[in-house]
């Protein structure tokens, strides 16, 4: 996907797409919705965002394709920023949009920064305002920049040693991936089910499911897996990656049999295991 950019005095790469208000989004639609022969439109923008043919065709059923595309992109891509959008428009050679809407976009970004940096309102000293926003250790207390991850790791306590190996292999190497490990990253005192749902659906691009005999007995793992599978049929295969790291005595879970397995127990492919997994989490 595209990287960030800058406009005037504002670093657009640090501004999430949510900063763009309705007026700017509507004007983008006026530029991109028409099927012009000489200018790239919303379908080219969707391709730059990483959508495939069937996903793009599905957007055609909405009356405002560009508006729906922007909404979907900022939900699915945690790196969706104003800078990323500008870079894609530049790559599409839509300099007319950058010129005409540049001041409006910069104004929206300035408003976002002012709101973010504004002092928090006074409240009861017994209530910490950060509590309603922070669910992970590195969350922004203001709630404007929630912590995001490359992958949520679904595991049971008995498999923690393999989770620790994943951390050393994927985070502390050149792959530099960011994993969401519940016992390490999530703050205590939060509702288990709602926080897990938030992390899987909105904070993590992928989910790695560590399959073992102990996994089959875990109600938490069962919930996490079924929740991830429920998040839209078109995203299942892209989102969830089953990993088998040791031999099992019990049958492999049937709900995961249709997804390609990353098998650490296969001696023929073990040498490629970490590279395959890292690339699957990076794409």
UniProtKB/Swiss-Prot annotation:
- A Pfam family assignment: TIR_2
Keyword field: Cytoplasm, Immunity, Inflammatory response, Innate immunity
Where do the Death domain residues begin and end? 27-105
Q: Where is this region: Disordered?
A: 120-143
Q: Which PROSITE patterns match?
A: DEATH_DOMAIN, TIR
Keyword hit for Zinc: no
Q: Where do the TIR domain residues begin and end?
A: 147-281
- Compartmental location: Cytoplasm
Report the SUPFAM superfamilies cross-referenced here.
Answer: DEATH domain (SSF47986), Toll/Interleukin receptor TIR domain (SSF52200)
Q: Name one GO molecular function term.
A: TIR domain binding
Cysteine pairs bridged by disulfides in the record: none
Which biological process annotations from GO are given for this protein? Answer: inflammatory response; innate immune response; MyD88-dependent toll-like receptor signaling pathway; positive regulation of canonical NF-kappaB signal transduction
The entry's cellular-component GO terms read: cytoplasm
**Which residues lie in Basic and acidic residues bias regions?**
120-140
Region Intermediate domain: which residues?
106-143
Q: Provide the domain comment.
A: The intermediate domain (ID) is required for the phosphorylation and activation of IRAK.
Protein role: Adapter protein involved in the Toll-like receptor and IL-1 receptor signaling pathway in the innate immune response.
Protein name listed in UniProt: Myeloid differentiation primary response protein MyD88
């Amino acid at each position: 996907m595209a990287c960030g950019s800058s406009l005037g005095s504002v670093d657009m790469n640090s501004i999430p797409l949510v900063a763009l208000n309705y007026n700017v989004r509507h004007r983008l639609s006026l530029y991109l919705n028409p099927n012009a022969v000489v200018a790239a439109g919303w379908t080219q923008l969707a391709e730059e965002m990483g959508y495939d043919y069937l996903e793009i065709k599905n957007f055609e059923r909405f009356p405002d394709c560009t508006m729906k595309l922007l909404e979907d992109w900022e939900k699915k891509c945690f790196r969706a920023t104003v800078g990323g959008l500008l870079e894609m428009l530049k790559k599409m050679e839509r300099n007319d949009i950058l010129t005409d809407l540049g001041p409006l976009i910069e104004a929206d970004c300035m408003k976002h920064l002012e709101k973010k940096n504004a002092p928090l309102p006074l409240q009861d000293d017994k209530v910490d305002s950060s509590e309603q926003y922070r669910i992970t250790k590195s969350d922004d207390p203001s709630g404007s920049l929630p912590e995001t991850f490359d992958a949520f790791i679904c595991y049971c306590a008995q498999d923690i040693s393999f989770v620790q190996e994943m951390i050393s292999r994927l985070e502390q190497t050149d792959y530099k991936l960011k994993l969401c490990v519940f016992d390490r990253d999530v703050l205590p005192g939060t509702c288990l089910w709602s926080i897990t749902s938030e992390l899987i659906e909105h904070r993590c691009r992928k989910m790695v499911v560590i399959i073992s005999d102990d996994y089959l007995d875990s109600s938490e793992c069962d919930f996490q897996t079924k929740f991830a599978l429920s998040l839209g049929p078109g995203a299942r295969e892209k989102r969830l990656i089953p990993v088998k790291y040791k031999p099992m005595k019990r049958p492999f879970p049937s709900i995961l049999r249709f997804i390609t397995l990353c098998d650490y127990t296969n001696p023929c492919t073990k040498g490629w295991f970490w590279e395959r997994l890292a690339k699957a989490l990076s794409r």
